[in-house]
Curated annotation (Swiss-Prot):
Transmembrane segments annotated in the record for this chain: none
SMART domains tied to this protein: RWD, WD40
Protein name in the entry: Maintenance of telomere capping protein 5
Entry annotated with the keyword Transport: yes
Region listing for Disordered, in residue ranges: 963-990
Similarity annotation: Belongs to the WD repeat WDR59 family.
Superkingdom to which the source organism belongs: Eukaryota
Keywords: Membrane, Phosphoprotein, Protein transport, Repeat, Transport, Vacuole, WD repeat
Amino acid sequence: MCSSINEGPYNSPTFGKSLSLKVDGGFNAVSINPSGRDIVLASRQGLYIIDLDDPFTPPRWLHHITPWQVADVQWSPHPAKPYWIVSTSNQKAIIWNLAKSSSNAIEFVLHGHSRAITDINFNPQHPDVLATCSVDTYVHAWDMRSPHRPFYSTSSWRSAASQVKWNYKDPNVLASSHGNDIFVWDLRKGSTPLCSLKGHVSSVNSIDFNRFKYSEIMSSSNDGTVKFWDYSKSTTESKRTVTTNFPIWRGRYLPFGEGYCIMPMVGGNNAVYLINLCDDDDSEQNKKTKLQPIYAFKGHSDRVIDFLWRSRHTCDGDYDDREFQLVTWSKDCDLKLWPISDSIYGKVNFDRGKRLEEKLPDYDYCSYNKEPENRENVQKNEFRRLRENFVTTSGLKKNKTNHITWLSGIRMNSATSQEDLFNETKIQNLGEEVSAIGHKFPKVVFEKISVSTRELCLTLNGPWSEENPDDYIFLRISINFPLNYPNKGDPPKFTIEENSNLTMSKRQEILSNLATIGQKYTDSNLYCLEPCIRFVLGEKVSLEDIEEGQEPLLNFDIADHIDFEELSSLDSSYSDSQNPENLSSQSDIESYKEALVFPDTSNQGLDFGRNLALDTTPVPNGCGSCWTATGELFCFFANEKKPEKKQNAIIKLSQKEAGVEKHPFKIEPQVLYDKEVDSSVITAADELKARPKRYVDTLGLGGGTNGDSRTYFDDETSSDDSFDSVADDWDDILRNDIIVRTKIPILRGNFKAFSSVHSESGKTVESTKKNKNLVISKNFSSLLSDRKELALEYLFMDATPEGFARNNALVAEKFDLDEISHCWQILSDMLIDQSDYDPYTTIWNNHPMGIKWFIKEAIVYFERQQNLQMLAMLCCVILSARRKKIPARYYGQELENMEGTIVFNDNESQNTSFWKGSDAFSTRSRSSTVTPNFYGNHLRGKNIHGGDNSSIRSDDHHARLRTHNTLNGSSKFTEPAQKQGSRAISSSPFHSRMPDIKVELLHDDIIEAYEQEDLLHLEVSDIPKFQTYIYQYSKLLFRWGLPLERVKILKVSTDFRSSYSSQGIPPNNNKKSPYNGVLTHWIENNEFGEEKFLARNCNYCDLRVTRSSFICGNCQHVLHSSCARIWWEIGDECPSGCGCNCPEMFDA
């Protein structure tokens, strides 16, 4: 049913020690086995069961994939049901049975709430009873012997329930928090509360009953107070109030002594505070005090989600010998165990060794981390009717947690260690050593990792063939580590599996050398697994360095034995902790200088798995620059300041030519810069030419690197000083860049540090590192024609065209831009509102020197000036002027109930006078069907026959039209075929007593002016170019941080589509916009006269959205649900380009 490695809690290797576990996976709730052996973490992916006595074993994963975050999880506290765990899943509660297989571990599903469950609590006295509370304001009590419905329900009716807790002394009493209030309920009194406690001014986040006094309860709230109540004495005032400077997320009584623990929701240094509850003066009611913690558990880098207590004691003892350990789970994904010292016990008045009134409960000290061997139900209910399984479990994922990755997140330290666990970078245990080795040697396969039993089994390939030394053979090695490893006299024991390719003599040779290496390292209290693996891989290991007190540095040339493609690195957090910049003391820095060790492979062939002569990776940039959208230029350089005193020689470590070397770990410094050589013959070009051109050369690994190459400098030549300093900085940068670039970690437990070269001035590279780079910022915005301040005040919407131009002229004048201001002033004069369809205005607009000419010349001029802002604004203003002047006939609108429609009637007494000195035709308002072009003809005719004697008239002006219609009323007019320079008006009655009359006006200047009027002011062929200007300007606005102005100008640019249609050029609807703008168009009626369905396209894939979709509540842009999942993984702004952060504004 459960596994047990250690005999009891007092053999636990982690109790009383500091432990840190890195567990990624978005876990939001945590609980602990009552025996203190296991921890359960709950998330949307299911449950993780972690064995605290064997944290190096990967967790057991119970899959349960849901979209809802787990609000709470709790392990059954009863010895009768130690395998039960309850967790939330939205409005349901799930009972898990760990004694079953992970694929069939769900025992019950409790469904009685209509909203999400917020808290769960087992009854401390009845193992089958638990309580749940929910956002639906209800509190339910459940009996697992009848789990179909709750046996008790109550509600506050006003506020959602956030917490529910049972009384430790009375199994019929429970309390729940609703908003700012706490209600105490008695199951025997129905849904009427026993009492209500009101005193908080903000939401209550946590409540807890006193373990020893049945009527006392504590509450913690967002108002930053902790209140202690005794509802047997008073329900209106709290017994005591403790104020803090942060909102409190959880607060509970200690399971020992007289005290309590609280943890903040935000702030509070992400710590858990322990406070003494003992108060000599308990008579004073509602006593207010400030927070005075006796101890603070600090170490997390993010908010603490919850804290638990782990305990152990002897079985059937008459004395209280309990020991405790604090367990915390934080949002930084760290599970930490904190030992409790005897001094803390004394501060909370916990008397260990006191005689017990009743014996403590006895729990089976076993772990549920492993899958059960058999699937037999613990309750032996084999006689239940078998249920059909409609869903198979064959497709369930297996527990594929990477063991090496899991080990890399575990760090454990002794409680008596002088080092801080959470700041220490040294190897502390076998698990950390195995994790580091697994990351460094990805070709070494660990078949078995059991840190608890201290057994390893690994496989690798080594050059141990007697027939051909260059051939690699397969080896399987088993390693047993003593309990006190790596103390002196406790070397590991190696066993090599027999292999047909491995002779007995070679096998004995390998075992003998491994035993020698292990003995030498453990005699110096050093971990020996890495040098042993290196030896089996074929590398020569020197033991003399250990005798001389020099600890070998981890070989950076890991590529000697594995391919570059398979090179792995530790997690970023681990790599950061190993960075030489993080050296904590001056002694560490000095040790770098004294014991800088690189393997000298001058005796070995440079075999890196590929030809390094083809590696052209460049060295890091020494300088560079970039422009900003506001016209600022940022430049960075290596610091060229000449040091006060040059060092005599700068040492660079490199590998020599192939050869035989006795000690491969010895240092062989090489002088690159020498003062004694005359530098007068060395030029600056030679200086630069001698620098490395490839990154591999900077590491001293290139096969073509000449070990005798030198670069010289002259202190007396001022022109060479900058090159000297650059050379110094360059060498230091490359040397310190080794760790960052290769990301190969350093095991500080075995090896000394690596630092900069000592200088005669007494300064190290680290001491002057802040001056290594120089960043210069220069503002050249005055040289640019585009101005952000103009964009903030320019107008191009919600006004008349002349108003736009006049405002923009004043804005340009405000910033002393006279040329731009004059252009806007001229344009505003040309756009002044004129009487509609005045013949003089029409002719002037088409004049060769009119507005169209001016706009064309202005655009050409500003194109030469490269003034993108002015080009885009001119296009927007001209387009707004066109929209104002364009008549209805260009939009194809029907005109209904038009006044001025010509009416024909055959009644002489009712004849309409057409031209008898009156100013216009006598008209009658009548509804008639008119084609769009007729309206233009009618307006033209109205001007032609006007009585203005001063107007220009042709001979055709005096032609009288008379037509009689036999029908009483209505006539339908159609426009005949048109020819250039002529117009015809005709009437075609069905039964006319008079012959048809047709009047043509030929070569009329005024009519031609109207007919040929160009209302666009722009060349149609140039419209795509102008649209490009607007689009590029919108991108510039976005880079300036003006998303609203960007959206406005993009909206204006979409009106260019109507410009195409008005000129008789149909837009290409099949062509996608190259600018990803939001294009709008009118929905036309279909052949049945019904409007088409208003469908919207996805802003990601541009396909129609018909089913599940994501609609932003702020910008109203639409995405398919599947497209939204893809986009929000790679982007943080709306895919339409509007600049909205849609996930945050979803329900705006």
